[in-house]
Amino acid sequence: MTTVVITGAAGNIGTKLRRHFEGLGWTLRLLDPVAIAHEGAVVADLAVWHDDWVAQFREADAVVHLAGNPSPKGSWGSVQRLNFDLTMNVYEAAVRQGARRLVFASSNWVVAGHRFEDWPLTAEIDPYPVNPYGVSKLVGERLGRSYSDRWGLSVICFRIGYCQRDHDNQPGAHMGWGLWGQRMWLSDRDLCQGFEKAVRAPADVRFAVLNLVSQNEGMRWDLEAARQTIGYEPLDHSVPTESDDARAQTAASRHARRLIETTEGFVQEQKW
C-alpha cells in the first residue's frame, strides 16, 4: 500500500491530487491549516515545528509538498514564513521520519524573467525569478538538492504550469499573462498523472527539476527531461488565443522590458 503525505491538502492542487490519489487506493495523510473532512487529515501550521504533525511523515513513500503562500503577489514577509521556513521544516521532517521521496511543487515563476525571450525553457536554464514568490520556489529547489546530496532523500521538483482553480481549469483568453499564461496551461489530468508518476518513479531518481505543463501549441517548456525521468507524456493540449487588448499589452510589456535592459546596460557601461 502506497502512503503519501500531502501538505497544503485543502488548496487547489491539493484537492485535485487528493481525489486522484484516493481513486488509486493510496493511504493519505493530509496536512493543512484548514480542516479537511478526511480521516487522515491533521490541522497544522507547518511553519511551527511540532511533533504531532512531524509524526505524519513517518516512513511515508512520498511527501507531496504543496503548502505555502501560492500568490505571485506575496510579500517578502509572507513568503519568508510560509515558503522558506515552512519548506525547510518539511524537508527536515521528511528526512528525520524516513520518508522515501519528496515531490516539491515549484513554479514557472522561477523562470518568469525569460518571458519575452525565445529560447526553450529547460531545467538547466539560468533561473530568473521576478518576485519574492519565484525566489522562494527557487530556494525550495536548492534545498531539495541539498537534502538529496547530504541525506539521500529522493527529491523531484515540478515547475508547475498554470492550473486554474476556476473556469473548470479550461484554457482560454480569460487566463492572465496573454499567450505566456495560456502556453503554460496544465490540465487536471496532466497535473494528476505527473504527480502520480513522480510518486511511482524508480528509486534511482535521486534529484530532478522537471517542467510540468500540458502539450500546448507554441509553448517553450521543454518536457524531454520529464519524459525520460518519470515517463510523463501529456494527455491534453490547447491552442492559445489572444484578444487585441492582450496582444497590445504583451507588446507594450515587451517594449518596456527592452527599454529597461537598454538602460541597465548603459548605466553599467558608464564610469561614474
Task: Name each region found by the language model.
Residues 4-24:
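N-terminal Rossmann NAD(P)H-binding glycine-rich loop of SDR-like oxidoreductase domains
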Residues 33-49:
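Rossmann-fold cofactor-recognition segment
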Residues 46-82:
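NAD(P)H-binding glycine-rich loop region in Rossmannoid oxidoreductase-like domains
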Residues 63, 74-102:
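NAD(P)-cofactor binding segment of oxidoreductase domains
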Residues 81, 118-155:
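Catalytic helix-loop patch of NAD(P)-dependent Rossmann-fold dehydrogenases
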Residues 89-130:
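Conserved Rossmann-fold NAD(P)-dependent oxidoreductase catalytic core, especially the SDR/UDP-sugar
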Residues 162-172, 185-207, 215:
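Alpha-helical substrate-binding/gating segment
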Residues 171-173, 209-210, 215-233, 247-272:
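Conserved C-terminal active-site "lid" loop/helix of NAD(P)H-dependent oxidoreductases
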